[in-house]
Amino acid sequence: MPGLHQNAWVVGERSSKLKVFGPEGIDQFTQGIEMAYAHDYVFRNEHHGDAIAPLQFAGFDTRVIDLNNPVIFDNGELKITAFKVIHEPIEPALGFRFEYKGRSIVISGDTSYTQTVIDNSMNADVLFHEAQANHMLAIMEESLRSRGADLLATVLDDITTYHTTLVEAAEIANEANVKKLFFYHLTPAPRNYIQEIMFVRGVDQVREEWTLVEDGTLVILPVGSDEIIVTNM
């Protein structure tokens, strides 16, 4: 976020502050970034001038999402809806549904298995769902404890309680009648083909249509079509 907001200001020819939508507490986050960059804003403006780094457009225009009014953007073509997910003790944690001219994408955000993802993913073209291989974490935890690294082992055990396994995410996609499931935010991230095979263990027994994303995975939904194009940036 810090780098994005700075680059969009200096080289992005932004004509307003960067709009950021988020749950309660997002304003504290963006204010903290603005405080950290306060001198940088001035220095860049003095160096580059208003044409490149106008001070009036530095920083954020922060919007706190009201979950009682979950549609955070709707211009008649693009509609973005926020919904609450379960990632305790983080509260609130949000997922998002994007709808554009008959096509739809849902992003789960960080969450354990939760009904709200199913409800908000109904008949979506694409669901991006976080995925954690607890069976691999268990192996890592056992190895760490055998070497006396109990603190790190406990961390690995702790994170199993607030994420979703791949099989659970596949079941969510099935329940919601999602056309294509993409696993993202992979934990532990597989580094090679053998690890990928271990990572996705059990998914094929639950669902056929799924993809394990990589950095640069690009999903395109042509308007007026049911096609889902998967490529790389």
Question: Language model features by range: what are they?
Answer:
Residues 95, 104, 112-215:
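Cap/insert and terminal regions of metallo-dependent hydrolase folds
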Residues 1-106, 112, 193-232:
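Binuclear metal-dependent hydrolase catalytic cores
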Residues 9, 148-152, 233:
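Generic signal for short, ordered secondary-structure residues
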